[in-house]
From Swiss-Prot:
Start-end of Basic and acidic residues biased regions: 155-164, 387-396, 620-633, 815-831
Name recorded for this polypeptide: AF4/FMR2 family member 2
One Pfam family in the UniProt entry: AF-4
Species the sequence originates in: Mus musculus
UniProt keywords, alphabetically: mRNA processing, mRNA splicing, Nucleus, Phosphoprotein, RNA-binding
Family label: Belongs to the AF4 family.
Biased composition (Low complexity): 165-179, 210-227, 715-734
Compositionally biased intervals (Pro residues): 841-850
Compositionally biased intervals (Basic residues): 634-644
Coiled coil: none
Residue ranges, compositional bias (Polar residues): 180-189, 374-384, 436-450, 580-590, 887-899
Role of this protein: RNA-binding protein. Might be involved in alternative splicing regulation through an interaction with G-quartet RNA structure.
Length: 1272
């Protein structure tokens, strides 16, 4: 069927329409066409082979999914179809269908409308359930269709029976129809177009047709029908699609009429016009009264079996084009074919409102003149109208709905329109959905889905009509071009396209249905809800209509494509439910560009819905935020911090992503609003939480207090009073007073900007940028309470740090589990931030502490006691400026053991939380005792924002408080720090008494006061605090795996290498734990061996030996070499006993065999010369040597061989260890300052250092490398 034939037939149809004796002329034309078709049948079927073999059917059925079953039911068995396809007579029916569109007798008209119904029916097999919802929209149309369809069904059912002629009327009809169908093969587009015109009109009318079924339908057929038809055709990609769909039902349906109709959409694969009269006859239009029972009826072959009303309604009412477009029928099919969830944006017309329907009908009427002019130029449009009239007449003759008959029989398209308008006022008050139920109670059964789909389809048809009116001109040419899509129909299986469209529509429709109840919550019945939604959304439909007007046919095609993108909308179904159905449909229907507008209009309406979901969403979030302060600080940090990141991304970038995800901008907008609202509320609480969390990141005391106050701004005075027990409260308070202002200032802006956390971070940076001048001011010495540090185990300190809100005593006694939990949470945060990869165990352990942390803790306890006794004197002593100095420019001061332990606790929790900033403890911002809480809070917030920010923030906060607290705390700290850790610890207690309570001291301690205050004073880099708590091997293994997975996910080689090295440290800790626990199943030697391999792999990522290698690469190489060296030495120590045994055994063996060896003449001296003779060489050969009695070499037992190999492997570890150590020494020369600071801060690393010291030393170095490389 080429375009020429199509238009030629179209012209014939037009002439027929102009003929007054249409039935006679149509009959003649049918006969003529039948003859032509018969002549062209062979060529057509062979040349075009429209459907080849039903590979699609097999494909779908093989999948075994519901859709495949539906398709199978729809298409029927191909074997059954073969006969029909092979028969010329059946092929005539199937192939000639396209001609049905134009010159058909009134029966053909009813057929035209019926074809869509059949198509619908055929579609129903898959889509019955899906279309069931759709049928409701066109109840009036259904009535018209029902009349037409009943008549058509009768005639059609008889057609299948008679195949051509059945009853006199039907005989002519059938004869004409076979001809028509045959000719339709030639002119499939015409039938499609007519069907489109009929159903598109019906679709737009669906809302209105319910009100005035016959007239509106007939009227809309020429108007919106034509446009919709074209749109649908375009959407269907070609008239042929519709043709195929039309034909598909007919041809194979001889055996399975309903299947054929259902296969009408799917059957297009069959070469002959599947939409044959026979199938149409089989699809006797009886089911308008019946609810869609499902595919069973559709698949039922008996021609008498009437498809469910919904099928006929949805399909009969819908133009096949609409079916192709997946509009109403697609909507219904959506329900049924969720898999192919291709939401059809075109399907979404917001207004199914009675008034909207009236407007649509009017527009369609207006379209009828304008569009009809265009379409009248297009014979198919006229044919569709007049055919509709004829169909109506036929249906009136045969159908039970006589009022409609009378209207359709007596009324011209204009008259029908007037009648429709008359009917409209009657039905308009009633929801179109209600009208639909009236026409079809069964439809109401599907009304739940159908009502929304109906409203969508009606509104869609309305918008389509409007858009067609506006786009009629623009679309007119495309319609002409529409036939061009035929090749795709011939080449491409139309059922596939249609199903995709329908499925997309189904999803959108389903979403729409859900949304409709959501929006019109007050209206329980989906029908009523759609009406309200439609009414509310009216403006939106107009917008939607406007959009279609503006958009070209390409846009329509795009819309088709969009439905697929909208498939993503299932994810946003919740949002859709929140949005009004109309809104959702509008967004679907409208192209992405204009959807936002519609959404905007609906947003207020949506917001009404949104608040509920938002309330739900926000409520949990807010609850979480509210609860977060209440639960242990560790929880608050993790939970509060986590929710915040979620919210942040959503309002910022995620909104765009969400838009992408949720194609519907409307959906996106409400969602974004929802998030904004929930985020604004939750963000407020989250900001508070975050602030409190940040405060938490600060000393535990501060966080605890801040949480208690549940405001980011803590009552610093209270904190100061509580925290500065030993320090002069006045000084600390004085220091605190400024920090509170800063804190409040920082916090308030943070709160303001918390919704966009990026902004919040930036704000902190700005604050830090202000502070830089203050950064020069060193922060007061570390302020961890010596008592707390000493009393608290490292684990407990970490736990307390996590629980910062808890009091000192509580923190001290908090179980290590809390600390572990907190580190894990923090690590999760770290995973998010991917800043500090330090495992929680690492952060808790202060690197500077001696390997014997127990001794340190005992010392700390003693120091605490001493500090308790001498806090005042110590405070003045702490004046030493070196202690004030920020190790990393951060104010954190290391209270050595106490401060470190506290800092380890706080920082361990903080780093995990804000590892993104500095490595765990790195972000600890040392704040002077009393000031520490306030400063720490503000500084911590800044630190949370940025690692650099932390440095500045610490400097800034101290700058404010430094005068007071620095004078006190720093003086005491420095004085005490003159001594080693003990002095520092004593100083720390004094400062800590006030400062540690605020747990800011811990934060400051991360600032890395070295064991030797004088040496550490020179260090300007941040110091990590490490947890001395002991964990089992599994704990370290999990940490190592996390770090390794992070490294695996990275693409930047340096960052990957650093993370692998960090993971290797955790594996090393795991091996060390295995050594401690004899019950561990895995050998620590194996763990170390695997760790060595990981380190070697990490070193291969960067070629440090290259002249282009950066200092960072060389520094990393040094750290890796140190690790490798100590690991090799450790491996040797683990196997040293075995090596000694092997050595003894080997020595004994060689001694025993020494005499034998001397007795045996050596092959090398067989000829009396130093060089072996050829004979001796031969003797030495492995083959001959063993069997040679005289000169045979001594055979070495396998046992000795293995012992020697093992001995070599073990001893080689020593060689490798020293070799790598030497390499590290060489590379260290290029970065003396870096490693000098590292040695100063962490203590020199030697070949005899413990694995714990190694891990802390290297981890501290890796932290600095991250900072230098901006990886934190």
């Amino acid at each position: 069927m080429d375009l020429f034939d199509f238009f030629r037939d179209w012209d014939l149809e037009q002439q027929c329409h102009y003929e007054q004796d249409r039935s006679a002329l149509k009959k003649r034309e049918w006969e003529r066409r039948n003859q032509e078709v018969q002549q062209e049948e062979d060529l057509f079927s062979s040349g075009f082979d429209l459907f080849g073999e039903p590979y699609k059917v097999a494909e779908y059925t093989n999948k075994g999914d519901a859709l495949a079953n539906r398709v199978q039911n729809t298409l029927g068995s191909y074997d059954e179809m073969k006969d029909l396809l092979s028969n010329h007579s059946s092929q005539n029916h199937l192939v000639g269908i396209p001609k049905n569109s134009a010159p058909q007798t009134p029966i053909s008209k009813s057929e035209a409308s019926f074809y869509p119904e059949q198509k619908n029916r055929m579609i129903p097999s898959h889509q019955e359930t899906t279309h069931s919802s759709t049928p409701m929209p066109p109840p009036s149309v259904v009535i018209l269709n029902s009349t037409l369809i009943h008549s058509n069904r009768k005639s059609k059912s008889e057609w299948p029976r008679d195949s051509h002629n059945t009853s006199p009327a039907q005989a002519s009809q059938t004869s004409s129809q076979p001809n028509k169908m045959q000719t339709s093969t030639q002119d499939p587009p015409q039938t499609r177009l007519e069907d489109f015109f009929v159903y598109p009109a019906e679709q737009p009318q669906i809302g209105t047709v319910e009100k005035s079924n016959p007239s509106s339908k007939e009227e809309n057929n020429p108007n919106s029908g034509g446009e919709d038809t074209f749109k649908e055709i375009f959407q269907s990609n070609s008239p042929e699609e519709s043709e195929f769909t039309v034909q598909a039902p007919g041809s194979p349906l001889v055996a399975s009429s309903l299947l054929a109709p259902s296969s009408g959409l799917s059957v297009p694969t069959f070469p002959p016009g599947l939409y044959c009269k026979t199938s149409m006859g089989q699809q006797k239009p009886t089911a308008y009264v019946r609810p869609m029972d499902g595919q069973d009826q559709a698949t039922d072959i008996s021609p008498t079996l009437k498809p469910s009303i919904e099928f006929e309604n949805s399909f009969g009412n819908l133009s096949f084009g609409s079916l192709l477009d997946g509009k109403p029928s697609a909507v219904s099919s959506k329900t049924k074919l969720p898999k192919f969830t291709i939401l059809q944006t075109s399907e979404v017309s917001l207004t199914s409102d009675p008034s909207c329907v009236e407007e649509i009908l009017r527009e369609s009427q207006h379209l009828t003149p304008g569009f009809t002019l265009q379409k009248w130029s297009d014979p198919s449009s006229r044919a569709s109208t007049k055919m509709l009239e004829d169909d109506l007449k036929l249906s009136s003759d045969e159908d039970d709905l006589e009022p409609v008959k009378t209207l359709t029989t007596q009324c011209t398209a204009n008259e029908l329109y007037q009648a429709v308008e008359k009917a409209k006022p009657k039905n308009n008050p009633v929801n179109p959905l209600l009208a639909t139920p009236q026409s079809t109670p069964a439809t109401q059964t599907n009304v739940g889905s159908g009502s929304s789909s109906e409203s969508e389809s009606s509104s869609e048809s309305d918008s389509d009509t409007e858009s067609s009116t506006t786009d009629s001109e623009s679309n007119e040419a495309p319609r002409v071009a529409t036939p061009e899509p035929e090749p795709p129909s011939t080449n491409k299986w139309q059922l596939d396209k249609w199903l995709n469209k329908v499925t997309s529509q189904n999803k959108s429709f389903i979403c729409g249905q859900n949304e409709t109840p959501t929006e019109t919550i007050s209206l329980p019945p989906p029908i009523i809800q759609p009406v309200e939604v439609q009414v509310k959304v009216k403006p939106n439909p107009s917008q939607a209509v406007a959009v279609p007007k503006e958009r070209p046919l390409l846009s329509l095609i795009r819309e088709k494509a969009r439905p697929r993108p909208t498939q993503k909308t299932p994810e946003t179904k919740a949002l859709k439910h929140k949005l009004s159905t109309s809104v959702d449909t509008v967004s679907q229907r409208t192209i992405g560009k204009k959807q936002p507008k519609k959404v905007e209009k609906n947003t207020s309406f949506e917001e009404f819905t949104w608040p509920k979901p938002n309330i739900t969403n926000s409520t949990p979030k807010e609850k979480g935020s509210v609860e977060l302060p209440d639960p242990p600080r560790s929880r608050n940090k993790a939970t509060a911090h986590k929710p915040v990141p979620r919210k942040e991304p959503r309002p910022h970038v995620p909104l765009a992503t969400e838009k992408k995800k949720y194609r519907g901008p409307g959906k996106i907008v409400p969602k974004s609003r929802e998030f904004i609202e929930t985020d604004s509320s939750t963000s407020d609480s989250n900001t508070d939480q975050e602030e409190t969390l940040q405060i938490k990141v600060l000393p535990p005391c501060i966080t605890s207090k801040s949480k208690e106050t549940s405001n980011a701004s803590l009552t610093l005075s209270t904190l100061t009073n509580g925290n500065s027990n030993n320090l002069s409260t006045s000084n600390e308070e004085t220091a605190f007073s400024p920090p509170p202002a800063m804190q409040t200032e920082l916090l308030s802006p943070l709160r303001d900007h918390e919704n966009p956390k990026n902004l919040w971070v930036k704000i902190d940076l700005d604050l830090l940028s202000r502070v830089p001048g203050q950064n020069s001011v060193p922060v007061t010495p570390a302020k961890t309470d010596y008592k707390e540090t000493a009393s608290k185990p490292k684990r407990q300190t970490a736990a307390t740090a996590v629980e910062k809100p808890a009091p000192k005593g509580k923190r001290k006694h908090k179980p290590a589990e809390t600390a572990e939990k907190i580190p894990e949470k923090k690590q999760r945060l770290e995973d998010n931030t991917t800043i500090c990869l330090l495992p929680p165990c690492i952060s808790p352990a202060p690197p500077h502490k001696p390997p014997s942390t127990r001794e340190n803790s005992s010392r700390r306890a003693n120091r605490k006691k001493e500090e308790k006794l001498f806090p005042p004197a110590l405070s003045p002593l702490a004046e030493d400026p070196p202690r004030r100095r920020n190790v990393s420019g951060n104010n954190g001061h290391f209270g050595q053991d106490k401060n470190i332990s506290m800092a380890g606790q706080i920082t361990s929790s903080k780093p995990k939380r804000s590892e993104g900033k500095f490595c765990a403890t790195f972000k600890g911002i040392s704040i002077n005792e009393g000031d520490a809480p306030k400063k720490a809070a503000s500084a911590t917030v800044t630190v949370a924002n940025m690692a650099l920010a932390t440095a500045t923030a610490t400097a800034t906060v101290p700058a404010i408080v430094t005068a007071t607290v620095t004078a006190t705390a720093t003086t005491t700290a420095t004085a005490t720090t003159t001594t080693t850790t003990t002095t520092i610890s004593s100083i720390t207690p004094t400062i800590t008494s006030g400062l540690m309570d605020s747990s800011h001291l811990e934060m400051t301690s991360w600032a890395a006061l070295p064991l030797l205050s004088s040496s550490s004073a020179n260090v300007r880099r941040p110091k990590l605090t490490f947890d001395d708590s002991v964990h089992n091997a599994d704990f370290y293994m999990q940490e190592a795996k996390k770090l390794k997975h992070k490294a695996d996910a990275l693409f930047e080689k340096f960052g990957k290498a650093v993370n692998y090295a960090d993971a290797a440290l955790s594996f090393t800790e795991c091996g060390n734990a295995m050594e401690r626990d004899p019950l561990e199943a895995k050998s620590p030697y194996t763990m170390y061996s695997e760790t060595v391999e990981l380190l070697r792999y990490a070193m291969r990522l960067k070629n440090f030996a290259s002249p282009l290698a950066s200092d960072g690469d060389k520094k990393l190489a040094v750290l890796c070499y140190r690790c490798l060296s100590l690991l090799y030495l450790r491996m040797f120590k683990l196997k040293k006993d075995h090596a000694m045994k092997y050595s003894r055994s080997l020595m004994e063996y060689f001694k025993q065999n020494a005499s034998k060896v001397t007795q045996i003449p050596s092959p090398w001296v067989g000829n009396g010369k130093n060089t072996p003779s050829p004979v001796s060489l031969n003797n030495v050969s492995p083959i001959n040597s063993v069997g040679n009695c005289n000169n045979g070499p001594v055979t070495i037992p396998q046992r000795i061989h293995h012992m020697a190999a093992s001995h070599v492997n073990i001893t080689s570890n020593v060689l490798r260890g020293y070799e790598h150590w030497d390499m590290a020494d060489k590379l260290t020369r290029d970065n003396k300052e870096f490693f000098g600071d590292l040695d100063t801060l962490m203590g020199p690393l030697t070949q005899h250092s413990s694995m714990t010291n190694l891990v802390r030393y290297v981890r501290q170095g890796l932290c600095w490398l991250r900072i230098d490389a901006h990886l934190l």
